[in-house]
Amino acid sequence: MAAISREEVAHLARLSRLAVTEEELGTLAGQLDVILQAVAQVGEVTAADIPPTSHSVPLTNVLRDDVVAPCLSPQEALSGAPDAEEQRFRVPRILDEDVAS
């Protein structure tokens, strides 16, 4: 398996909106390469005799009845909030750019 390049790490950092120094690019490339090699080894395991599962242990009766129980009113839920608007928590905007681009 080919090693992950510094350019690929820089691209992933940009997509993740992470500020990464040149020194960190090299370190991260090495670390990600080790992770990818481990994932490749897992993919090589022959498991034809093992049935596919969604959990490592069997799960039964994991759902509970949907019972209406007392809960907080909107006013009670928002009472400790620093800012609220129209019965909703109001938080500062974190994205200053158009998400579609």
From Swiss-Prot:
User: What is the protein's species of origin?
Assistant: Salinispora arenicola (strain CNS-205)
> What is the annotated quaternary arrangement, including any partners?
Heterotrimer of A, B and C subunits.
- Which SUPFAM superfamilies does the record match to this protein? Glu-tRNAGln amidotransferase C subunit
Recorded hits in Pfam families, A to Z, give: GatC (PF02686)
Gene3D superfamilies, alphabetically?
Answer: Glu-tRNAGln amidotransferase C subunit, N-terminal domain
Q: What is this protein called in UniProt?
A: Aspartyl/glutamyl-tRNA(Asn/Gln) amidotransferase subunit C
Provide the reaction this enzyme catalyses. L-glutamyl-tRNA(Gln) + L-glutamine + ATP + H2O = L-glutaminyl-tRNA(Gln) + L-glutamate + ADP + phosphate + H(+); L-aspartyl-tRNA(Asn) + L-glutamine + ATP + H2O = L-asparaginyl-tRNA(Asn) + L-glutamate + ADP + phosphate + 2 H(+)
List the GO biological process terms: regulation of translational fidelity; translation
Q: Which family does it belong to?
A: Belongs to the GatC family.
| Membrane-spanning ranges | none
Q: Where is this region: Disordered?
A: 75-101
Q: What is its EC number?
A: 6.3.5.-
Offer an example of a GO molecular function term for this protein.
ATP binding
Concerning HAMAP family, the annotation shows: GatC
Signal peptide (UniProt feature, chain positions) = none
